[in-house]
């Protein structure tokens, strides 16, 4: 059971582990202090995601569901590290109760997909989640990378961009099974 859990964690964070290794390799090679600082910030942001995502998996397997509070802790820690990285970031999560492992990890995976896509250019990110009969996730992003491609891995996602270049990503996840 323990091996299965570790295999699941490794499989679900393999891309981020590879990103982390790439940045560590680049960090060892760079002589530019500004680039080194930027890489260290990215390493912290990606490392936080790996730690928190694995924690969601562990808690979910142990308890059969994940509390909204646990998801809140994940997003708050990631937001704090994005602020340290230099991007304005805030996460507001309203509601409580339980979510299925799939619901919680889908929300956190979308958050990470946005962060990864915008990592070099992210200026600000506002995350708003409301948990009721369904889970509604809204993100407002100021960055240079277009995010419309996120509809591929997240088919239920809605994406808009306003005249000022702000991007809005919305996702509704039914709250079945984890109530």
List the predicted regions and their residue ranges.
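Short alpha-helical H-box segment flanking the phosphoacceptor histidine in two-component systems
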Residues: 2-13
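Conserved DHp (HisKA) dimerization/phosphotransfer helix of two-component histidine kinases, i.e.
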Residues: 11-93
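Conserved ATP-binding N-box helix of the HATPase_c
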Residues: 16, 23, 27, 100-128
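Flexible, glycine-/charge-rich segments associated with ATP-binding catalytic modules
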Residues: 32, 38, 151-179
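Short beta-strand/loop element within the Bergerat-fold HATPase_c
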Residues: 126-136, 140
């Amino acid at each position: 059971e323990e091996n299965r859990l570790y295999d699941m964690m490794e499989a679900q964070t393999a891309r981020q582990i590879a990103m982390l290794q790439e940045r560590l390799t680049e960090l060892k090679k760079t002589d530019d202090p500004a680039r080194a600082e930027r890489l260290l910030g990215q390493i912290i942001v990606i490392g936080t995601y790996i730690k928190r995502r694995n924690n969601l998996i562990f808690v979910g397997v142990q308890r059969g569901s994940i509390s909204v509070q646990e998801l809140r802790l994940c997003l708050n820690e990631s937001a704090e590290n994005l602020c340290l990285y230099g991007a304005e970031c805030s996460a507001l999560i309203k509601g409580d109760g339980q979510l299925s492992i799939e619901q919680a990890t889908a929300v956190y995976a979308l958050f990470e997909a946005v962060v990864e896509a915008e990592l070099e250019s992210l200026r600000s990110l506002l995350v708003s989640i409301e948990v009721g009969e369904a889970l509604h996730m809204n993100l407002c992003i100021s960055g240079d990378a277009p995010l419309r491609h996120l509809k591929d891995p997240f088919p239920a996602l809605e994406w808009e961009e306003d005249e000022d270049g702000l991007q809005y990503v919305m996702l509704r996840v039914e709250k079945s099974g984890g109530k």
